Amino acid sequence: MKNKTEYYDQFIAKVPNFPKKGILFYDITSVLLKPEVYTSLINEVYSFYNLKKIDCIAVVESRGYLIGAPLSLKMQLPLVLIRKEGKLPREVFGEEYELEYGFGRIEVHKDDVRMYSNILLIDDILATGGTLKSSAILLERAGGRVKNIFCFIELCGINGRRILEGYKVNSLVRYD
């Protein structure tokens, strides 16, 4: 996937000391304010993944939904939601994860993932890789196969790709 940092950087707000001191938060919600930019993002991802063998798209709460939901419609694929603990009403698989700034637990409905389905996993940002690694483990435990991972932004200096070794990881925006 081509590096599009130069184009998208102007539309990504950088918020220092959020959610806690010492963290620089990359806010992609400003991309949503420009429909032409948001459309461009979805079209870029669609163009890259459209011809790959993908059976469903799984998205990480909550900003992963912003990319995955329109993409699943465009690709005519089922959308599987990965949520924070306690937000799903049916039987779930759960997995612990570590964030850049804390810990948490994610869940997926046990019956949302088809056995042996090829999954494109999407989140907005790749930092430590902890959330995505836990999401991939969760989906695989539910019977799926995570074939590809896409993140809009990748913080290369943190090197989250290291713990995602074995997965095909792509991003459009890369910051050192």
Swiss-Prot record:
Keyword match Electron transport: no
GO BP term, example: AMP salvage
Documented EC number(s): 2.4.2.7
Keyword Hydrolase: no
Key words of the record: Cytoplasm, Glycosyltransferase, Purine salvage, Transferase
Functional note: Catalyzes a salvage reaction resulting in the formation of AMP, that is energically less costly than de novo synthesis.
Record's protein name: Adenine phosphoribosyltransferase
Organism of this sequence: Borreliella afzelii (strain PKo) (Borrelia afzelii)
Gene: apt
